[in-house]
């Protein structure tokens, strides 16, 4: 039997999964980590998480086919080892994950996290049977992956899907990319925390403490129907809906799948989001495009990273001359 490792490097966490060849998770491991600012530590921690997953293989004879890595950066398909110095300046423009090939003796494949979220949904989740859809990940950052005519489309240099840097308000807040009013400045985790802190005086009955506000606290409070948290989520849904309406008018996907941590709040996000999209799309067939949650939960992107290896093996078995013994 063979297994595949998938790694999801978020801005503030690392997740590893060991899957079988049907995308089923055999083992998983998770660690909070300052990925953006500590590349050496992130790589070392990733190896520890991989070792943890491999230690829980169902059989010593389960061989490792390859390792897929999802990164929070555009990835040029022609140069997958390169990372954006704008998004991850501390990484110096390179992932450094060649060390995984050396350490584990198997091929390593790297792609953008939203692309791999889309790939996972296409193979195993809410995108099965849908030839054209968009996957949007809402977390610390905001990104999208696009399946068009049955394939993930990355663009000429790998930057397709950077929906987080679509300007919603050109007079808005300054974004880390240097532009103003990018979508991420309205719906990214930091933006939601700041929004909740700013609105707190208007909601004296809210359970949220401005001194200890986190995105996780906002999500939990929204689930509990805290009025401040519900308002923050509704505001985010409004801005996200503006971007999605533009996406629907432009490329007309059959579905939009929302992933990332904010999906934990359920219809408190999707309800107002759908309303905004309906108001802002001018063709009924476009407005009817299904907007739904990811079916794969918090492990979805890591499963997508593993699926990247499986896709490569099916497309070109010659890339896998040997199967690692580990």
Question: For each of these PLM feature ranges, what is it?
Answer:
Residues 1-63, 102-104, 124, 130, ...:
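ATP-binding/phosphotransfer module of carbohydrate and carboxylate kinases, centering on a glycine-rich
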Residues 7, 57, 63-193, 304, ...:
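Phosphate-binding/catalytic loop of phosphoryl-transfer enzymes
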């Amino acid at each position: 039997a063979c297994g595949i490792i998938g790694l999801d490097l978020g801005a503030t966490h690392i997740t590893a999964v060991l899957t079988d060849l049907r995308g089923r998770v055999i083992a998983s491991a998770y660690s909070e980590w300052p990925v953006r600012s500590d590349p050496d530590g992130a790589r070392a921690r990733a190896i520890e998480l991989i070792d943890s997953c491999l230690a829980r293989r169902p059989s010593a004879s389960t061989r490792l086919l390859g390792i897929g890595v999802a990164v929070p950066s555009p990835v040029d398909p022609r140069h997958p080892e390169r990372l954006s110095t704008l998004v991850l300046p501390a990484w110096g423009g390179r992932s450094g994950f060649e060390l995984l090939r050396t350490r584990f003796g198997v091929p390593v494949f790297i792609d953008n996290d939203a692309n791999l979220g889309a790939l996972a949904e296409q193979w195993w989740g809410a995108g099965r049977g849908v030839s054209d859809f968009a996957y949007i990940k809402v977390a610390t950052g905001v990104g999208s992956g696009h399946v068009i005519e049955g394939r993930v489309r990355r663009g000429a240099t790998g930057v397709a899907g950077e929906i987080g840097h679509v300007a919603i308000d050109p007079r808005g807040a300054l974004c880390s990319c240097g532009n103003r009013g990018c979508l991420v400045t309205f719906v990214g985790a930091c933006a939601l925390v700041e929004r909740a802190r700013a609105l707190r005086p208007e909601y004296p009955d809210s359970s949220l403490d401005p001194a200890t506000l986190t995105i996780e606290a906002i999500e939990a409070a929204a689930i509990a129907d805290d009025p401040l948290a519900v308002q923050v989520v509704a505001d985010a849904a409004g801005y996200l809906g503006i971007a999605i309406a533009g996406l629907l008018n432009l490329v007309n996907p059959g579905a939009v799948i929302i992933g990332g941590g904010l999906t934990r709040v359920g219809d408190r996000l999707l309800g107002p989001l759908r309303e905004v999209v309906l108001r802002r799309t001018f063709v009924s067939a476009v407005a009817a495009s299904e907007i739904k949650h990811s079916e794969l939960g918090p492990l979805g992107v890591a499963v997508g990273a593993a699926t990247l290896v499986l896709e490569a093996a099916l497309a070109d078995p010659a890339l896998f001359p040997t199967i690692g013994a580990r």
